[in-house]
Amino acid sequence: MQCATPLRAQQFEIGLDMPLQFISSTEHNAATAGLVLANDADAHTVTLDNVQRIDLHFPKFTDGRAFSQAFILRRRGFTGDIRAHGDVLIDQLVQMQRSGFSSVVLRDDQNIEHGKKLLSHYKSFYQGDAIHPQPHFAKEAA
């Protein structure tokens, strides 16, 4: 399977280990597709050998199955790009990053600058996440 070459993307830090990349819909459509995982696919059973990018689709912003898929893929040790596309809103960005997404293609009516401003409010989290499952209080006790 051929995976996408790195895209020119606007990238910024949100205070966590993985920077979240914003990919324009034009760049996403022009890129070679990664592994496209259907919403009803079991992320526990997909083969990850030689996969560099996995595309997870949000058919509606209310459909949260891709959050679970991203979380499972990170827990399985996948370190490549997990990209969200479809009906993706800026309101979902923090949860996407914490679930394991590394790049997003926002819905056309969403404002990237507004999303960055919203994300800047969160420097750290008390709970664990897909990348760092240990809760904050347990790290301090160690």
Question: Positions of the model-derived regions?
Answer:
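Intrinsic disorder/low-complexity detector
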Residues: 1-47, 122, 127
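Glycine/Thr-rich beta-alpha phosphate-binding loop at enzyme active sites
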Residues: 33-75
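Catalytic cores of alpha/beta
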Residues: 44, 90-103
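Active-site-proximal loop/turn and secondary-structure-junction residues that shape catalytic pockets
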Residues: 60-62, 88-90, 110
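Glycine-rich beta-to-alpha transition loops that act as phosphate-gripper elements at the mouths
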Residues: 80-89
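Glycine-rich phosphate-binding active-site loops on the catalytic face of alpha/beta enzymes
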Residues: 101-118
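C-terminal helical cap(s) of enzyme catalytic domains, especially alpha/beta-barrels
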Residues: 114-138
